[in-house]
Amino acid sequence: LNAFIDHIHPLDIFAHLIVGAEGTLAFFSEVVLDTIDDPPLKTMGLVLFDSVASSMAALPVLVNEGADAVEMLDDASLRTAQYLNNPPYDPHQIADNSAALSFEFQKHHVNEIEHLTQSIPHALTLMGGHLPLGMISDDAQRLQLWNIRKGLYPTVGSMRKKGTSVITEDLCYDYRDLPKVVNELKLICHQWEYDDAVIFGHAKDGN
C-alpha cells in the first residue's frame, strides 16, 4: 500500500509496485534507443584562473559560444594530475585557491573550429585566464586532458588511507552561485579536517 500512499504520479506508483518483497513483478521486454549527433571535429582547452570566482565569471563566454562540455576543477583536483603518466601541465605549479575550466567544442565544419581556436583564447585571456596548452584538436592530446577529469574519482580513491572510505556528495546550484558554494565547501572540509577533499563538476550545468 505504501506505493499508493507515498506517491502521486502514476509512474512513481508503478515503479514502486514492480519491486517488492516477493521479487520483481515486471521487466523491460524491449528498449528503443535514439542515437545522438557526434560531430567529427572537436577542439578542447584548459584555462587556469587565480580563483573560482574568476573561472565562473568566464563561464558565460564558453556557454554563449556553444561549448558542448565545461568542467570546473579546483586546485586540489588539478594537482591529482601528478599521479598520471606524462601530465599535460605541471601540477606542482598549481597555486592555492586557483581553479580551471576544461571545455570542449564539437563542430561539423573546419571554419567553425578555426574561428573558435582564435576567438576563445583571446576572450578568456581578457578575463584573466591562462591556457597553458592552447586549444587542442589532436585526439590523443584531448584524451590525455580528459583523463584528468575522468580519472579524478579513482585517483582520489586510490590515495585514501588504509581503513578509510571515499565520501562523495553531488550538489546542484545555479552556476552563478558556484564561487560562494565552492569557497564555503572548502571551509567546511577544512573545519572537519577533510584536508584531502577535491571539488569538481559540470560547471555548465551547475552540478
Name each model-derived stretch.
Residues 1-207:
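Noncatalytic alpha-helical scaffold of FAD-dependent oxidoreductases
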